[in-house]
Amino acid sequence: MEPEQMLEGQTQVAENPHSEYGLTDNVERIVENEKINAEKSSKQKVDLQSLPTRAYLDQTVVPILLQGLAVLAKERPPNPIEFLASYLLKNKAQFEDRN
């Protein structure tokens, strides 16, 4: 590699304000997106706190509970409460992302 090309590469790296930490433009974009998503989720949590009880339950509990009860009615296990509890615990991740 010619010295001029190496110098050009170094100036490009120096133009990036986070280059001293080794962050690329893609990583910077990802970090910015994560910050924005975190701000949105914190705003949503505040909104959930201000909702009336019925609306809060409709947005958070009812969707997973209805799905769990449908599976419970279909399978009719001998211990329905334990079945429903384990179903809710196993499937909570897919519903937490929606809130």
Swiss-Prot record:
Please give the InterPro entries that the UniProt record associates with this protein. Dpy-30_motif (IPR007858), DPY30_SDC1_DD (IPR049629), Sdc1/DPY30 (IPR037856)
N6-acetyllysine sites (modified residues): K35
Q: Which residues carry this modification: Phosphoserine?
A: S19
Chief place where the protein resides? nucleus
**Which GO annotations describe the biological process of this protein?**
endosomal transport; transcription initiation-coupled chromatin remodeling
Provide the cross-link position: Glycyl lysine isopeptide (Lys-Gly) (interchain with G-Cter in SUMO2): K35
Q: Which UniProt keywords apply?
A: Acetylation, Chromatin regulator, Golgi apparatus, Isopeptide bond, Nucleus, Phosphoprotein, Transcription, Transcription regulation, Ubl conjugation
UniProt keyword Heme, yes or no:
no
Supply one GO CC term from the record. MLL1 complex
Q: Name one Pfam family in it.
A: Dpy-30
Query: What positions are modified (N-acetylmethionine)?
Result: M1
Q: Does the keyword Zinc apply?
A: no
* Alphabetized GO MF terms: identical protein binding; protein homodimerization activity
- Positions of the region Disordered? 1-26
- Location(s) in or outside the cell: Nucleus; Golgi apparatus, trans-Golgi network
Q: What does the record note on quaternary structure?
A: Homodimer. Core component of several methyltransferase-containing complexes including MLL1/MLL, MLL2/3 (also named ASCOM complex) and MLL4/WBP7. Each complex is at least composed of ASH2L, RBBP5, WDR5, DPY30, one or more specific histone methyltransferases (KMT2A/MLL1, KMT2D/MLL2, KMT2C/MLL3 and KMT2B/MLL4), and the facultative components MEN1, HCFC1, HCFC2, NCOA6, KDM6A, PAXIP1/PTIP, PAGR1 and alpha- and beta-tubulin. Interacts with ASH2L; the interaction is direct. Interacts with ARFGEF1.
Which family is it part of?
A: Belongs to the dpy-30 family.
Summarizing the function annotation, the protein's role is: As part of the MLL1/MLL complex, involved in the methylation of histone H3 at 'Lys-4', particularly trimethylation. Histone H3 'Lys-4' methylation represents a specific tag for epigenetic transcriptional activation. May play some role in histone H3 acetylation. In a teratocarcinoma cell, plays a crucial role in retinoic acid-induced differentiation along the neural lineage, regulating gene induction and H3 'Lys-4' methylation at key developmental loci. May also play an indirect or direct role in endosomal transport.
This one is known as Protein dpy-30 homolog
